[in-house]
């Protein structure tokens, strides 16, 4: 079952694609794609509005990161779907503080598999996002909190040696 965040990501991807093909505003395109289910859920609408407004506000910055990583490619040569999936994931990585970057990247890969422009779209999206994320992390530009922390360990803490039990033979 898709989460509401996956549904919203897919709707925003469709809106971004429509904007490039039809030359309408992102707000117009996104408004056409909202479902009753999303409109009725306050958490879904909060995420939708955050992602949409962040993409609009930071598109030039996001495109610069993509252009720096794809320096051998002109942005116009990158498939529209792939470019917009990367835009959306980078926006989440940079501006959605509670979403772990690996979740954003994984969601982008899964969406690329579904909406693939080529059979290698998911690998292309993964490679570009991974490279940009590593660069941003090295430069200290990724700021996460709560559930979005980058290096949060999920392993069990080790018992202190004083509490360890010895096995007698």
UniProtKB/Swiss-Prot annotation:
Pfam families in the record: NusB
Region called Disordered, residue ranges: 147-169
Gene Ontology BP terms: DNA-templated transcription termination; transcription antitermination
UniProt keywords, alphabetically: RNA-binding, Transcription, Transcription antitermination, Transcription regulation
GO CC aspect terms: cytosol
Gene Ontology MF: a single term: RNA binding
Family listed: Belongs to the NusB family.
PANTHER family reported in the protein's UniProt record: ANTITERMINATION NUSB DOMAIN-CONTAINING PROTEIN, N UTILIZATION SUBSTANCE PROTEIN B-RELATED
Function, as annotated: Involved in transcription antitermination. Required for transcription of ribosomal RNA (rRNA) genes. Binds specifically to the boxA antiterminator sequence of the ribosomal RNA (rrn) operons.
Protein name (database record): Transcription antitermination protein NusB
Organism for this UniProt entry: Chlorobium chlorochromatii (strain CaD3)
């Amino acid at each position: 079952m898709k989460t509401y965040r996956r549904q919203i990501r897919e709707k925003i991807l469709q809106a971004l694609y429509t904007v490039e093909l039809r030359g309408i505003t992102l707000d117009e395109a996104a408004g056409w794609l909202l479902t009753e289910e999303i409109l009725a859920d306050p958490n879904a609408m909060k995420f939708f509005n955050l992602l949409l407004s962040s993409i609009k506000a930071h598109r030039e910055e996001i495109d610069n990161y993509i252009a720096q990583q794809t320096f051998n490619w002109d942005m116009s040569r990158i498939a529209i779907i792939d470019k917009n999936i990367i835009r959306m994931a980078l926006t989440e990585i940079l501006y959605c503080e509670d979403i772990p970057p690996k979740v954003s990247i994984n969601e982008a890969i899964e969406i690329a598999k579904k909406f693939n422009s080529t059979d290698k779209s998911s690998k292309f999206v993964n490679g570009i996002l991974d490279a940009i994320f590593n660069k941003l992390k090295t430069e200290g530009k990724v700021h996460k909190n709560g559930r979005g922390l980058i290096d949060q360990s999920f392993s069990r803490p080790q018992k202190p040696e004083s509490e360890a039990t010895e096995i007698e033979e």
